[in-house]
């Protein structure tokens, strides 16, 4: 064997070893991220199931808790689908429903996005026009809005699944782009509503002569919105917006934003119970139901942790409406 041939053989062997080492490293990273996604999703499913159980069967529902209930439902279904999807990727068993799971993920992501925007917008309306809100707002507005958001999210995800070949048809480039454009425009509109309403609510709290007192419910809303922006929004940008600018991202990046989206869905129940436990009496029994009620408490507290006596806004509005 000539020196040139021997050198080429050695170099070729080194290249192959480096290639297989790199592939093995990628597979290990991919599987590790998917296992983390599964663990976070299981924890999140337990938390959201607890919220669903308490709000659905053990607590009196109001205009805002209806949105929280639907948000917990969207997060629970999203985490369920993501768990199955990640296990299919790692274990590589029957993937006949692989693309169907993508449609379910899009459906619940869109629904959850809408619920967060609805919570912020409704709260903004209640403090900006309190008399109209308490006197003229239809009684079943929250349930109606949630039903419309679920229906529109389902329709949009089915159109995307059908046009992009996720369901029962072949990939149609033109129709897929058209549906993706509608979904992207819808997400931008919902995000602008969320952004403007959150800023208006923040301005009402910290600015002006008629500043509203900070309650636990405002803290809950603020943390929920912030967590969604930092953890839940990136996957929406990657899936719906980046294809329009023809930006190709690595599979590792997509796994990371998927992990962040699971953290977002898992974090909401933790936020509720954390806010409910702030300044809690140590001698008082801390049940999950009580913590959830306190997280949605809309009256400020005095130093002792009790509700402020001056906050009877809802009662005053009822009297004003009836007079």
UniProtKB/Swiss-Prot annotation:
Q: Which domain of life is it from?
A: Eukaryota
Q: Which GO terms describe its cellular component?
A: plasma membrane
Glycosylation site list:
11
A single GO molecular-function term is: G protein-coupled receptor activity
Presence of the UniProt keyword Ribosomal protein in the record: no
Q: How does it sit in the membrane?
A: Multi-pass membrane protein
Matching entries from Gene3D superfamilies are given as: Rhodopsin 7-helix transmembrane proteins
PROSITE patterns documented for this protein: G_PROTEIN_RECEP_F1_1, G_PROTEIN_RECEP_F1_2
Q: What is its main location?
A: membrane
Among SUPFAM superfamilies, the record links this protein to: Family A G protein-coupled receptor-like
Enumerate the subcellular locations listed in this protein's record, separating them with semicolons: Membrane
UniProtKB keywords: G-protein coupled receptor, Glycoprotein, Membrane, Receptor, Transducer, Transmembrane, Transmembrane helix
Which InterPro entries does this entry report, sorted A to Z? GPCR_Rhodpsn, GPCR_Rhodpsn_7TM, MRGPCRFAMILY
Q: In which tissues is it expressed?
A: Expressed strongly in newborn dorsal root ganglia, adult dorsal root ganglia and trigeminal ganlia.
The residue ranges crossing the membrane are 35-55, 64-84, 99-119, 148-168, 181-201, 225-245, 256-276
Those parts of the protein on the Cytoplasmic side are: 56-63, 120-147, 202-224, 277-323
Record family assignment:
Belongs to the G-protein coupled receptor 1 family. Mas subfamily.
Instruction: Output this protein's name.
Output: Mas-related G-protein coupled receptor member B4
Which species is this UniProt entry from? Rattus norvegicus
């Amino acid at each position: 064997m000539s020196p040139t041939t021997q050198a080429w053989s050695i170099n070729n062997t080194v290249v192959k070893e480096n290639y297989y080492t790199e592939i093995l490293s990628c597979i290990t990273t991919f599987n590790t991220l998917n296992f983390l996604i599964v663990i976070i999703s299981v924890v999140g499913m337990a938390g959201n199931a607890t919220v669903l159980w308490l709000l659905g069967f053990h607590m009196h529902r109001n205009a805002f808790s209806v949105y929280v209930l639907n948000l917990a439902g969207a997060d629970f279904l999203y985490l369920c689908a993501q768990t199955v999807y990640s296990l299919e990727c790692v274990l590589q068993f029957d993937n006949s429903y692989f693309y169907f799971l993508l449609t379910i993920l899009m459906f619940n992501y869109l629904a959850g996005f809408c619920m967060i925007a609805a919570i912020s917008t409704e709260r903004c309306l209640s403090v900006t026009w309190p008399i109209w809100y308490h006197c003229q707002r239809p009684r079943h507005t929250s349930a109606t809005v949630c039903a419309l958001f679920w229906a529109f999210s389902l329709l949009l995800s089915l159109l995307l699944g059908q046009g992009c070949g996720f369901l029962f048809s072949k990939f149609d480039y033109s129709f897929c782009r058209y549906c993706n454009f509608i979904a992207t425009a819808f997400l931008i509109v919902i995000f602008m509503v969320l952004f403007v309403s959150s800023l208006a609510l923040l301005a009402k709290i910290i600015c002006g002569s008629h500043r509203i007192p900070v309650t636990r419910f405002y803290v809950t809303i603020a943390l929920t919105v912030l967590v969604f922006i930092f953890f839940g929004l990136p996957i929406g940008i990657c899936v719906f917006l980046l294809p329009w600018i023809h930006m190709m991202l690595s599979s590792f990046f997509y796994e990371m934003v998927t992990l962040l989206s699971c953290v977002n869905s898992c974090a909401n129940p933790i936020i509720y119970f954390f806010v409910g436990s702030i300044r809690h009496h140590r001698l008082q029994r801390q049940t999950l139901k009580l913590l959830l009620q306190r997280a949605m408490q809309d009256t400020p507290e005095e130093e002792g942790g009790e509700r402020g006596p001056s906050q009877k806004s809802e009662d005053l509005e009822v009297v004003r409406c009836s007079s």
